[in-house]
Design a protein with these regions (language model features):
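Conserved catalytic cores of phosphodiester-cleaving nucleases, focusing on short active-site segments
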Residues: 28, 34-72
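A near-ubiquitous, low-amplitude feature marking generic local secondary-structure context
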Residues: 2-5, 48, 52, 78, ...
Length: 110
């Protein structure tokens, strides 16, 4: 993984052991999305999305992220406790509310 991702994780105090970068093409056709999967200190499974698109994140895409996380849960037969998204663009207020209502942690980065 590159240095920028480690800096994002360190800034938000996300510490995952056995972290893996998942192949995004298995779950989505989005080229601006990176998916990381790992286990935290309390043995909970975490899913981290890194979105580097320049366009605004809309509610439709927030629903797609939820579908992708469900696909990952069924593929690995686990229950994801923490879902996080890092995004570099603006986010629609309805998309942010949708994600937060589904227990997502949302962080922007520049």
């Amino acid at each position: 993984m590159n240095q920028k991702i480690w800096e994002l994780f360190e800034a938000r105090k996300i510490l995952l052991k056995d972290i893996k970068a998942l192949n995004t093409s298995e779950f989505s056709t989005k080229k601006t999305l990176d998916i990381f999967w790992g286990v935290d200190n309390k043995s909970f499974y975490n899913l981290v999305f890194l979105r580097t698109a320049k366009s605004r994140l809309l509610r439709k895409e927030a629903l797609e992220l939820e579908e992708i996380s469900k696909k990952i849960e069924t593929k690995f037969q686990t229950s994801l406790r923490k879902k996080t998204i890092f995004y570099s663009s603006e986010i629609c207020s309805k998309a942010l509310k949708e994600l937060q209502d589904n227990n997502w942690r949302c962080y922007d980065f520049v």
